[in-house]
Amino acid sequence: MRVEKRGAQPTAGIRTTATLAEWGEVNALGPEVLEWLAARDIQPAPAPYYRYRVIGSFEEKFDVEVGYTVATAVPGDDRVLAGEFPTGDYVVTTHVGHPDQIATTHLALVDWAAGQGITLAKDGEVWVAMYESYQTDPAVEPDPNSWRTELAYLVA
């Protein structure tokens, strides 16, 4: 786990709310964003992100945005939001393993930050910038136990 300074990164994504039981609908948003970008000849980063604003559960809804970072800011529309990950210090780590086990890595990162005296950027229950970036292409590595996912939380 580490702290690293990052510059602003433009994004294009679709924001939704869903419980874990509805997560298939969330996962379906990635291909939709890719189609939207391709129709505009915009090259996305190879790794999709999931930006979490509110963490939910099987019964309570997550507020999540699924998308891709892009080289320069793009105009959004009614469906795809143009945004950015803000400039700042981020607490970062990499989860290696099945996505179903990623909550443990999130908890470890939050505990580590607290132990270092680092306050993560939140406004009540809403995270300012907390996201997962999926580093492994499932078409290349089909075993989810080998997948790598970067977790990043903006420092307050």
Residue spans for each PLM region:
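A solvent-exposed interaction/effector surface
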Residues: 1-156
